[in-house]
Regions:
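Short helix-loop capping/hinge motifs at secondary-structure junctions, enriched
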Residues: 13, 79-88, 115-117
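Short loop->beta-strand "edge-of-pocket" segments that line small-molecule binding or catalytic clefts
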Residues: 87-100, 140
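Ligand-binding cleft/hinge of the Venus flytrap
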Residues: 5-17, 57, 103-123, 138, ...
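Pocket-flanking alpha-helical
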Residues: 2-7, 22-62, 71-86, 103-107, ...
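Short coil/turn segments
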Residues: 1, 69, 78-82, 97-102, ...
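Pocket-lining segment of extracytoplasmic ligand-binding domains
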Residues: 128-133, 138-180
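Short beta-strand and adjacent tight-turn residues that come in two discontinuous sequence segments
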Residues: 24, 43-44, 64-66, 96, ...
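Short beta-strand-to-loop elements that line the ligand-binding cleft
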Residues: 18-26, 43, 117-127, 165-166
Length: 180
C-alpha cells in the first residue's frame, strides 16, 4: 500500500522517478527477475534472497531496505475444517503456491513444530486460486501472508470467526521478512 500511495500522491514523480508496479508471482519469481535485470527493484522475502545468492554466487542482486522485521508468513486455515494450530495440519490438505515465500519456509516451520510432513497432503495451487480454494473447501489451509490471505478470505465471504491464522513467527520461525 505505501508504494501505491506514493504513486497516487505524486511523491515518486516529485523526486524525478517514474515508477510502475507490476503484479508479482512471489519472492522466488521476483528475485531472479531483479538479478537478470528484467526489473530494477523487487519486493521479496530476504530469506529467499539469501537462498538464491547461496545457489547463485555473485548474482547482481542485493537487499537495500528491510520492510518487514517480522515475516507475515502464515498458514491460514478454516476452523470449520479443523485447522487452528500447527499439529492440525497432519491429516489436512494444504494449498501452497510453489513460488510462495511462506511455502519456501514450510520445511523449517514443520521441523520447528515436530510435524510429520508425510501426513500433510500438499496441493500445489496458483496465487489467484489459493484463497478461493480454501473458501470453497477444496483445501483445509493455505500458505501465504497473514494479512493478504485473511483479507482475501473475508472478501470471499468467509466469516472472520472461521479464519485461523498460524503466524510462523509465533511458532518457532524467527526470521526477517521482506526487503526491497
Amino acid at each position: 500500500a505505501p508504494y501505491f500511495l506514493a504513486i497516487d500522491k505524486g511523491f515518486f514523480k516529485s523526486e524525478g522517478l517514474e515508477v510502475e508496479i507490476t503484479p508479482g508471482k512471489g519472492s522466488l519469481a521476483a528475485i531472479p527477475k531483479v538479478a537478470t535485470g528484467a526489473f530494477p527493484f523487487g519486493f521479496a522475502d530476504i530469506n529467499s534472497l539469501i537462498k538464491f545468492l547461496d545457489q547463485n554466487p555473485g548474482a547482481p542482486v542485493i537487499a537495500i531496505m528491510m520492510v518487514y522485521d517480522k515475516p507475515p508468513f502464515a498458514i491460514v486455515g478454516r476452523k470449520s475444517r479443523g485447522v487452528e494450530k500447527p499439529k492440525d495440519l497432519e491429516g489436512a490438505v494444504l494449498g501452497a503456491p510453489p513460488p510462495d515465500g511462506a511455502w519456501a519456509q514450510f520445511p523449517s516451520f514443520a521441523k520447528a513444530n515436530n510435524l510429520d510432513v508425510k501426513k500433510v497432503k500438499v496441493e500445489p495451487v496458483g496465487f489467484p486460486t489459493r484463497e478461493p480454494m480454501l473458501a470453497e473447501g477444496k483445501v483445509d489451509a493455505v500458505t501465504g501472508y497473514s494479512f493478504s490471505s485473511y483479507l482475501n478470505l473475508a472478501r470471499l465471504g468467509v466469516p472472520e470467526s472461521d479464519i485461523s491464522t498460524i503466524l510462523m513467527a509465533d511458532y518457532g520461525l524467527k526470521l526477517y521478512g521482506n526487503a526491497i
